[in-house]
Amino acid sequence: MRIMGLDYGSVTVGVAISDSLKLTAQGIEVIRRKSETKLRQTLARIEELIKEYEVEEIVLGYPKNMNNTIGERAEKSEEFAEHLRRRTGLPVVLWDERLTTVAAHQVLNAGEVSLKKKMEVVDKLAAVFILQGYLDYLSNKKKLNLTDSL
């Protein structure tokens, strides 16, 4: 079983999947949305990926403001999380994604990636950063629990 990471945006949804050991995140695709208000096709594609990769949990980027408040984008992510829960029956974790897209752009700029290619992969890379942060959190939590039991 694996964990899916999503970077939800008004035009695209970046998708990443963990390995079966839940140690690393790999970007798998960017879902192009037809309209910000229509989710049916987006949710259908996510469901296909859930089945294909045997996903048991979803981590959704939660774009809080830099001062830790909840803005319009975060509210839209909360709504999308609820749609995901209802449609898939899976647990959905909202994960602080502040600066993940900025970090993705920095990585792509450092690699001298063309603008066209950058636009194709930035959301997928942001989803990788979101999921990898969550996987690292789980790994560290597990290590702390092992230490506590000694």
Curated annotation (Swiss-Prot):
**EC number(s) reported in the record:** 3.1.-.-
Question: Could you tell me which cysteines form disulfide bridges?
Answer: none
Pfam families referenced in this protein's UniProt entry, alphabetically: RuvX
In its UniProt record, which GO terms are filed under biological process? rRNA 5'-end processing
Q: Which GO terms describe its molecular function?
A: nuclease activity
Which Gene3D superfamilies does UniProt cross-reference here? YqgF/RNase H-like domain
Q: What is its main location?
A: cytoplasm
Domain of life where this protein originates: Bacteria
The family note in this entry says:
Belongs to the YqgF nuclease family.
Q: Which NCBIfam families match?
A: RNAse_H_YqgF (TIGR00250)
Q: What functional role does this protein have?
A: Could be a nuclease involved in processing of the 5'-end of pre-16S rRNA.
Instruction: Return the protein name.
Output: Putative pre-16S rRNA nuclease
Protein's organism: Lachnoclostridium phytofermentans (strain ATCC 700394 / DSM 18823 / ISDg)
Upper classification of the source organism reads: Bacteria, Bacillati, Bacillota, Clostridia, Lachnospirales
